[in-house]
């Protein structure tokens, strides 16, 4: 018996339906672009050529395959990750011919090409770079001499690499009475490590350990070419310090043969010119007039080549930029303190800032200028280097970031990169997208939600990582070692993936419109290196923010109380970093802004971090700070408190109780407000949202289906906002567009349903693996307290912070951090270190105790060293609830018998499988755990100005219209679904299985079939079934919906010989009202699975090629010569991800399949 359920939807109800008709007879430019996205909106991909294995036929097939599914651009990389070398060396005539052929083919097909500027993926280097033009580092040697006599002495030459060394200076100074060297000099001088947002250390240094500047003698002119110093030494003990520079020795990587060499000096335009002439110009010469047309872009990937801290002429550049000579401060680069601890630290701040400025100007900006001179755009990933990310990113025509698939997705770079684009006035924010671990086991449904979240961070262009060039046609083919999601023509779902590409293109067209809307502008500070900040608390309150660096701060102006940029950005408030340090010229700019009416918040600074204009700079900082903060012109208040108390309406406010796992972004054009809203959960949900828009008709633009609908229920408010209830499906995203004045007479303001809802069903083939209740470490972190404590010996700890302490990589693809709280005697201390750095603690004769140790990727909101709390196993409790029919389970302390768990963030963590797919959910206390199947929802829609209620269940709808009149209507009955159970005829490709036509008595996974050809099959098979539909069921007020149940992984639906849609994510439902007919109907469902099953099956067969570990040792003759294989294997994987004992993946049409009937009732 169905149970009677009140379906309360609060004040409002909306539905986004596949059943409505398209909206308006007059198609606007926005609608036209949504319906048929332009090339600019389409996805792009990296295109990796592997170890010189390239073929013309493969090039043509690759590019044609890209075009066929809607990829607009290939971005060429050349790498070597251990695959056997092919015949084509990088930059050889053969390679240049193949690049030229690629460009000709791209032109013919209508694609664009970009090329990475160097072999490998970082950064700019090659065998034509001599040591003179390579990255340079400061080296030194020192001797101690006794004075009161003349000396003629050979000074030891400092460390020399690659037989190249040049002197910088020779300095002498009295030997300090106390030996105390600068802590962490390798990152303070950028001689080995990188630390971001580094400010002067204020610890007091004893005067006996400090060199006085006036006592430093410059002996450079006394050193001859042979390294012999002649000098009359004053009385006392003197240190003679010889400083010079030598190459770091860093090379570009991972480069194939012909392309591997020294990394170029990135602070020298002369060196960059040499690099261009040897590495870029030959390509341009070969391509000719294809450059600037088909080949229109050159890329510098993320910076991964370490530090450098000198270039020829650095001293002159420093004096020009900083206004003082660095010569007397050079001993700091050898670890000595000059003048005082603080002055030394401030010089080092200037030193790092200068390195960042020179890299931005002489490498990135100069490279951009060379690109422009040759008709190319410049793309850049501006991070991970010894520079200011905001400054470097501003040099790019297309600024790029990255995000990974698999595991928990951290979005470190999208926010600051999108901010750079916004400040540059660009609507294109590129992203190296879905970087991850290969294995041919990912597909569009798994990627979608991560991509949706990336868009909400500001990305507007996906550039897939990666399409690996396939010189041969044996699948799954070449791979980028174990890296990357496999986007290429040999993947099982490549053709079917066009529906995913269409979704991307429609979405990115919308996201590229107008300008980003943000209320807060966050100043990232003046330090270099500088990675910017993440402030998720701003978005959690319903606002958005951009970041701005010191390079753009001077561009700001105030208009009508808003902080404005020259490209049209407008912000309500400028937020300063929490710091005691700021340069006076920056404070002068803040003064100008607040005098013009800007709102500025932040902590009051005390000093300048620089030695420029020392010490008058400090007096000026104090004067300005006292004035600005003393007069209340700048408020010392947190951004959260400011937003809560400033009477600034939230731009996007969820008024429902459950606000988590919803992300948004807002774009604004002259005519429209465009909100993108994404549900990250694998369950449908209803939320009520208040938008900071008024007197405009909301519309729902659904990029998956390409439909545009008007909601039936919404309301304007007097405060200038509009409330709109949204029904979001599992992992669904929609655009809410406000563009026309509201004049819909059929609008409703409230609705309530009481429905006879059928009993809930559990998720298909649900198996609970484990359920725990308590407070967990954030995703991406691992508690390693016990393992670190075991390393303490004799009250000493000497370890390297690495994932060797973990059973796995807790955050693949991200730079991780080690944090520890420990005790020495009575003192409790904390320490942190980046991955691969060393931690050395010596407690002497006191006891050293490790209290907490955590390793992984910390979220911005995770402060200090989080505690690992004990959790409760509630696996059996959850199983009991399911067995008793409770599928929506309250998450509270009753799960552990009413006891109170330790910790302040109580959550249930549950791992389960449904149809063989493993999922892990984290559900916080107070929210229900939903383990029921998703099912059709009732909807209220507007069709051609008529309000209609569409419901799959009988019941009553009560509603109120604009005039306040309350009415009701009833649907007394809804026809039962047509169940398509029983036998199905299934056809497999005849060339891949021994028995290609089979009959399934019931739907099952191919992996459960005894026939090994089917059990291990990977590819596409067709399901066939006929069913009857009565004339009565096709009456005008019935809607029919095909529900495939579970599918692994993509289904193409053909009904009565007509393709009606490709379903690539759950729920696998499709409106077929206009496709069925009275009487017999013929249904065909083409289902595509993934490669792992066939790869597992092939591992049971003899190898017909050589392996070295998981890699291919040599390319077999049968593949090179296209001859018959000597074994029954059908696959050729370049990397072994799967073994013969691995569990097979669920595959095929799993069902249950049915035709749902929904009744349409006009109001």
UniProtKB/Swiss-Prot annotation:
The keyword Hydrolase applies. Induction: By ulvan and rhamnose. Pfam families: Glyco_hydro_106, Glyco_hydro_2_N2. GO terms for molecular function: beta-glucuronidase activity. It comes from the Bacteria. Its EC number is 3.2.1.31. It catalyses: a beta-D-glucuronoside + H2O = D-glucuronate + an alcohol. GO terms for cellular component: periplasmic space. Keywords: Hydrolase, Periplasm, Signal. NCBIfam families: rhamnoside_JR. Glycoside hydrolase involved in ulvan degradation. Ulvan is the main polysaccharide component of the Ulvales (green seaweed) cell wall. It is composed of disaccharide building blocks comprising 3-sulfated rhamnose (Rha3S) linked to D-glucuronic acid (GlcA), L-iduronic acid (IduA), or D-xylose (Xyl). This is Putative beta-glucuronidase.
């Amino acid at each position: 018996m169905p149970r009677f359920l009140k379906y309360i939807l609060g004040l409002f109800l909306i539905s986004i339906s596949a059943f409505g008709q398209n909206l308006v007879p007059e198609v606007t430019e926005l609608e036209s672009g949504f319906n048929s996205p332009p090339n600019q909106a389409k996805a792009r991909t990296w295109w990796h050529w592997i170890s010189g294995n390239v073929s013309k036929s493969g090039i043509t097939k690759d590019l044609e395959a890209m075009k066929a599914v809607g990829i607009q651009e290939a971005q060429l990389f050349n790498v070597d990750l251990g695959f056997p070398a092919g015949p084509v060396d990088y930059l050889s005539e053969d390679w240049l011919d193949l690049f030229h052929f690629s460009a000709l083919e791209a032109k013919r097909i209508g694609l664009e090409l970009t090329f990475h500027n160097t072999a490998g993926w970082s950064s700019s280097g090659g065998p034509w770079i001599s040591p003179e033009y390579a990255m340079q580092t400061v080296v030194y040697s020192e001797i101690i001499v006794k004075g009161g006599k003349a000396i003629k002495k050979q000074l030891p030459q400092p460390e020399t690499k690659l037989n190249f060394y040049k002197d910088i200076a020779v300095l002498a100074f009295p030997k300090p009475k106390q030996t105390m060297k600068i802590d962490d000099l390798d990152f303070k001088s950028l001689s080995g490590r990188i630390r971001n947002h580094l400010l002067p250390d204020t610890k007091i240094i004893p005067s006996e350990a400090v060199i006085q500047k006036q006592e430093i003698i410059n002996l450079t002119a006394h050193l001859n070419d042979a390294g012999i110093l002649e000098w009359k030494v004053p009385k006392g003990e003197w240190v003679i310090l010889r400083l010079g520079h030598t190459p770091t020795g860093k090379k570009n990587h991972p480069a194939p043969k012909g392309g591997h060499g020294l990394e170029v000096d990135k602070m020298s335009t002369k060196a960059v010119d040499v690099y261009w002439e040897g590495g870029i110009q030959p390509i341009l010469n070969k391509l000719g007039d294809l450059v600037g047309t088909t080949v229109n872009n050159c890329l510098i990937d993320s910076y991964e080549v370490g530090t450098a801290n000198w270039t020829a002429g650095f001293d002159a550049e420093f004096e020009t930029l900083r206004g003082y000579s660095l010569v007397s401060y050079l001993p700091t680069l050898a670890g000595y303190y000059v003048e005082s601890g603080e002055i030394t630290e401030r010089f080092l701040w200037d030193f790092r800032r200068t390195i960042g400025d020179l890299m931005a100007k002489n490498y990135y900006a100069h490279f951009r200028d060379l690109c422009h001179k040759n008709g190319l755009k410049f793309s850049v990933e501006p991070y991970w280097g010894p520079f200011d990310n905001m400054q470097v990113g501003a040099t790019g025509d297309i600024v790029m970031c990255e995000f990974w698939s698999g595991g928990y997705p951290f979005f470190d770079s999208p926010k600051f990169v999108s901010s750079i684009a916004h400040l540059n006035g660009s609507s294109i924010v590129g992203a190296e997208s879905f970087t991850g671990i290969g294995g041919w086991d990912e597909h569009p449904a798994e990627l979608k939600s991560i991509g949706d979240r990336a868009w909400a961070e500001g990305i507007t262009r996906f550039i897939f990582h990666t399409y690996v060039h396939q010189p041969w046609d044996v699948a799954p083919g070449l791979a980028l070692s174990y890296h990357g999601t496999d986007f290429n023509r040999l993947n099982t779902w490549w053709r079917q993936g066009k529906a995913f590409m269409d979704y991307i293109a429609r979405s990115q067209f919308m996201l590229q419109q107008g300008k980003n809307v943000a209320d807060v502008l966050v100043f990232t500070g003046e330090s270099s290196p500088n990675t910017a900040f993440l402030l998720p608390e701003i978005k959690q309150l319903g606002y958005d923010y951009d970041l701005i660096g010191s390079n753009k701060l001077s561009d700001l102006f105030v208009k009508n109380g808003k902080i404005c940029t020259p490209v049209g950005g407008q912000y309500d408030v400028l937020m300063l970093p929490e710091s005691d340090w700021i340069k006076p010229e920056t404070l002068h700019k803040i003064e100008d802004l607040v005098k013009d009416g800007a709102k500025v918040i932040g902590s009051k600074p005390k000093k300048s971090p620089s030695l420029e204009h020392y010490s008058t700079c400090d007096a000026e900082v104090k004067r300005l700070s006292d004035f600005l903060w003393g007069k209340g012109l700048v408020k010392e208040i947190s951004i959260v408190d400011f937003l809560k108390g400033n009477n600034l309406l939230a731009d996007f406010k969820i008024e429902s109780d459950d606000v988590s796992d919803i992300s948004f972004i807002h774009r604004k054009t002259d005519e429209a407000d465009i909100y993108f809203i994404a549900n990250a959960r694998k369950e449908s949900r209803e939320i009520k949202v208040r938008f900071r828009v008024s007197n405009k008709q909301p519309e729902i633009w659904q990029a998956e289906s390409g439909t545009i609908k008007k909601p039936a229920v919404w309301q304007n408010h007097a405060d200038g906002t509009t409330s709109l209830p949204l029904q979001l499906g599992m992992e669904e995203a929609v655009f809410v567009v406000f563009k026309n004045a509201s004049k819909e007479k059929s609008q409703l303001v409230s609705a309530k349903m009481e429905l006879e809802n059928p009993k809930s069903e559990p998720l298909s083939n649900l198996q609970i693996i484990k359920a725990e209740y308590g407070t967990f470490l954030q995703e991406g972190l691992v508690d390693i307290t016990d393992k670190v404590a075991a390393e303490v010996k004799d009250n000493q700890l000497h370890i390297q912070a690495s994932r060797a302490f973990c059973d796995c990589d807790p955050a693949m693809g991200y730079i991780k951090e080690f944090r520890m709280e420990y005790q020495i005697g009575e003192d409790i201390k904390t320490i942190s270190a980046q991955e691969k750095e060393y931690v050395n603690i010596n407690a002497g004769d006191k006891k050293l105790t490790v209290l907490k140790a955590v390793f992984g990727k910390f979220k911005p909101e995770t402060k200090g060293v989080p505690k690992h709390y004990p959790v409760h196993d509630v696996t059996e409790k959850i199983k009991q609830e399911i067995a008793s029919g409770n599928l929506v389970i309250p998450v509270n302390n009753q799960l552990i018998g009413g006891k109170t768990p330790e910790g302040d963030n109580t959550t249930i963590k549950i791992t389960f499988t449904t149809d063989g797919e493993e999922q892990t959910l984290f559900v916080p206390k107070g929210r229900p755990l939903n383990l029921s199947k998703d099912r059709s929802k009732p909807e209220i829609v507007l069709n051609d100005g008529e309000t209609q209620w569409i419901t799959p269940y009988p019941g009553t709808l009560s509603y109120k219209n604009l005039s306040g009149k309350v009415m009701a209507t009833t649907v007394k009955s809804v026809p039962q679904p047509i169940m398509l159970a029983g036998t199905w005829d299934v056809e497999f490709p005849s060339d891949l299985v021994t028995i290609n036509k089979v009959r399934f008595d019931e739907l099952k996974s191919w992996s459960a079939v005894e026939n090994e050809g089917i059990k291990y099959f990977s590819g596409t098979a067709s399901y066939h079934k006929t069913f009857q539909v009565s004339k009565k069921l096709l009456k005008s007020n019935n809607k029919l919906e095909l529900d495939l149940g579970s599918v692994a992984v993509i289904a193409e639906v053909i009904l009565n010989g007509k393709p009606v849609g490709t379903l690539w994510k759950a729920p696998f439902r499709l409106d077929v009202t206009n496709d069925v007919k009275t009487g017999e109907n013929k249904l065909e469902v083409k289902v595509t699975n993934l490669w792992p099953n066939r790869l597992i099956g092939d591992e049971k067969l003899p190898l017909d090629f050589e392996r070295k570990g998981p890699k291919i040792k040599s390319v077999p003759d049968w593949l090179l010569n296209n001859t018959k294989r000597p074994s029954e294997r059908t696959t050729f994987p370049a990397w072994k991800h799967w073994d013969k004992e691995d569990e097979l993946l669920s595959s095929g049409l799993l069902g249950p399949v049915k035709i749902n009937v929904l009744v349409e009732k006009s109001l």
